[in-house]
C-alpha cells in the first residue's frame, strides 16, 4: 500500500544520501514530503523559527508515515527533533533508517549516528525507539523493503491512541546502536514506527 511519507534528515550532511533514498522510487514523487531545494531552505531559515515550523507542519499534512533517515549527526539536529515530535503526536507512524552506509558522491560511507528516537518517550515512560522499528538502508535492503516498513510503522502507530503523545526523554536513556548485520530491525519491547527528511 502506497503511503504519503515525510522524510526527516540532516540536510547539510546527508542530503546526498537522502536523495538516493528519494530516487529509489519506492515512494512515488507525489507521495514524498520534506525534500526542499537548498536555496528555498535558506530562504525559509532567514524568516526565523516560526517560518520553519510552519513549513514542517505544512509538509506533514496528509502524510501518515515519517521516515527518519539517520546519519552521523541526525540525532542532534533541532529540526529533526521537532519533526519527530510533531509526527508522532499528529498520528504518523515512524520508522528509523540508518543511511550512513550509502556511498556519497565521492563513493565514501559515513559513521553511524545514534537513533534520535532514543530521545523521546511515551506518557507511560516507554522509550520511542523500543516502539518504532529501525533498519539500515543498505544492510536491510531499503530499496526493496521501504514500502513494507512504512506499512509496519502505520500499523504500529494505530495501536496507540491519539492521546498517547510523546515528549523528550531525559539524557540518561541508554542509546541503541545501528544494526551491524542484516536483520528485521531491533527486537521491540512494544511495536515500532516511520517517515520524513530533515535539514540543517
Question: What is the role of each PLM region?
Answer:
Residues 1-62, 158-200:
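Conserved N-terminal substructure of TIR/SEFIR domains
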Residues 3, 90, 116:
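Residues that flank catalytic or metal-binding motifs in active/ligand-binding sites
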Residues 12-14, 101-104:
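Conserved nucleotide-binding/hydrolysis micro-motifs of P-loop NTPases
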Residues 18-19, 78-81, 106-108:
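A short acidic (Asp/Glu
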Residues 38-61, 122-123, 130-148:
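Extended, non-globular alpha-helical segments
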Residues 59-89, 93-103:
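Conserved beta-strand-loop-alpha-helix hinge of the TIR/SEFIR fold
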Residues 102-123:
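Glycine-rich, charge-decorated loop segments at or immediately adjacent to ligand/cofactor-binding or catalytic sites
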Residues 145-157:
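Non-catalytic, charged low-complexity extensions flanking SF2 helicase motor domains
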